[in-house]
Amino acid sequence: MKPLRKERLQQAIKQELSKILLEDMNDERLKFVTITDVELSDDQKYLKVYFSTMPGKNSEQILQSLERVKGYVSGEVARTLRLRFAPEIKFELDNSIERGVRMVKLLEDLEKKDEVKEDESHEDESTDHTEETNEEP
């Protein structure tokens, strides 16, 4: 399959999966799922689906719910997008968003610590300078 066609098909699958999970599923936990990426094999028989969920939601329960509905989801994707095969889906939790949020927080904390150190060093310099000017010759 040509790379551009594959990329377009993966985008269409990602949109369709999101729509199915939001509109067709009765399990409320699946309403909190975001499809972050999909990888379709060249023969279109296998589909790896990466998802994330809101912090505080039980990822393992959500993964189990996704596993229960993957046959239906696969069939709907194949039917809607007119694929030759209903791809075998494998769901994987994508922690990259969580890791990104943690990384941003760490960087912000480091920045705050640097600001505090700079403020302290400026205070020390001004204190040293004040002491020097108050000394008698």
UniProtKB/Swiss-Prot annotation:
Write one Pfam family the protein is assigned to. RBFA
The keyword Aminoacyl-tRNA synthetase is assigned to this record: no
What keyword terms does UniProt attach to this protein?
Cytoplasm, Ribosome biogenesis
Gene Ontology MF terms in the entry = ribosomal small subunit binding
Basic and acidic residues composition-biased segments = 127-137
Alphabetical GO CC annotations of the entry are: cytosol
Disordered, as annotated region? 112-137
**Which Gene3D superfamilies does its entry note?**
3.30.300.20
User: Where does it primarily localize?
Assistant: cytoplasm
Source domain of life is Bacteria
Location comes to: Cytoplasm
| InterPro entries, alphabetized | KH_dom-like_a/b, RbfA, RbfA_dom_sf, Ribosome-bd_factorA_CS
Cytoplasm as a keyword?
Answer: yes
| GO biological process per UniProt | maturation of SSU-rRNA
HAMAP family listed in its UniProt record: RbfA (MF_00003)
Please give the subunit comment from the record: Monomer. Binds 30S ribosomal subunits, but not 50S ribosomal subunits or 70S ribosomes.
Described purpose of this protein according to its UniProt entry: One of several proteins that assist in the late maturation steps of the functional core of the 30S ribosomal subunit. Associates with free 30S ribosomal subunits (but not with 30S subunits that are part of 70S ribosomes or polysomes). Required for efficient processing of 16S rRNA. May interact with the 5'-terminal helix region of 16S rRNA.
Q: Per the similarity annotation, which family is this?
A: Belongs to the RbfA family.
Q: What is this protein called?
A: Ribosome-binding factor A
